[in-house]
A protein has these predicted regions:
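GIY-YIG nuclease catalytic motif and its immediate N-terminal context
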Residues: 1-80
């Protein structure tokens, strides 16, 4: 399974990513081994996920979410 996810960082910012193993990726982010963007904003909290069978579909969705404004991402989080 392929997952697109949103993390809420300690400073309130949102980070969007893609993975095949949510648990391992969240642990990597919180241990400082994740994306550079999240390393200085620890801890992070998983606030939203979408699951896809197809990797291409997940990457396409990640691309679209990354281009959303903060307010649009907050609405997306609130919709689930």
């Amino acid at each position: 399974m392929n997952y697109v996810y949103l993390l809420r960082c300690a400073d309130g910012s949102l980070y969007c990513g893609w993975t095949t193993d949510l648990e391992a990726r969240l642990a990597a982010h919180n241990s400082g081994r994740g994306a550079k963007c999240t390393r200085s904003r620890l801890p992070v909290e998983l606030v939203y996920t979408e699951a896809y069978e197809d990797r291409h579909d997940a990457l396409s969705r990640e691309w679209h979410i990354k281009r959303m404004s903060h307010a649009e991402k907050e609405r997306l989080i609130g919709s689930k």
